[in-house]
């Protein structure tokens, strides 16, 4: 089981976080990550690889995007990056600070950039955005990812969500928007 999980992780890392920065960097892989569970580690970091296996941290291993400037909870986890059909880079991440509890992730952070350094961002806090609805009862939004839907000609974000429901088992599902 452990080998299967590790294989899945490596395949996902290679295929979902690979982007080509500029023409002179074609053939390199960019890995976008956070480094730990402390608030100071839940920030966006980059690593680069020429073979997709051995990655070297960029920026001295320091964050390239400070979470306290983009996230409601002042921490981000599970970043996912995609190079858009228009040449822009799109990144989504869980808006969460693990030190505030494992159910402190009530939203997502969406970002876009033309150069991987200067990012525009927008947060969606489900408790605020959907106040008074069932969606406001969310207490676990996990690992958002972005895909391009060629039929609809737009980007979709999908994520898992755990919400408060009556009964013994809370509702867990995968959603997209």
Please place each PLM-identified region on the residue numbering.
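Beta-rich carbohydrate-recognition and catalytic domains
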Residues: 22-141, 147-177
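Positively charged n-region of N-terminal signal peptides that target proteins for export
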Residues: 1-4
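General helical structural elements
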Residues: 6-7, 81
């Amino acid at each position: 089981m452990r080998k299967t999980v590790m294989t899945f992780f490596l395949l996902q890392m290679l295929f979902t976080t690979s982007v080509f920065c500029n023409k002179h960097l074609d053939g390199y892989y960019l890995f976008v990550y956070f480094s730990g569970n402390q608030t100071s580690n839940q920030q966006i970091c980059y690593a680069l690889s020429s073979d997709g296996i051995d990655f070297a941290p960029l920026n001295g291993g320091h964050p390239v995007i400070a979470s306290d400037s983009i996230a409601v909870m002042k921490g981000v986890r599970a970043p996912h990056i995609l190079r858009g059909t228009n040449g822009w880079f799109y990144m989504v991440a869980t808006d969460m600070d693990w030190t505030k509890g494992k159910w402190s992730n009530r939203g997502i952070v969406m970002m876009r950039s033309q150069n991987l350094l200067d990012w525009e961002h927008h947060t969606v806090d489900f408790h605020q955005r959907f106040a008074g609805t069932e969606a406001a009862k969310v207490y676990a939004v996990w690992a958002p990812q972005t895909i391009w839907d060629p039929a609809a000609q737009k980007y979709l974000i999908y994520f898992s969500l755990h919400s408060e429901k009556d009964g013994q088992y809370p509702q867990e599902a995968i959603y997209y928007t």
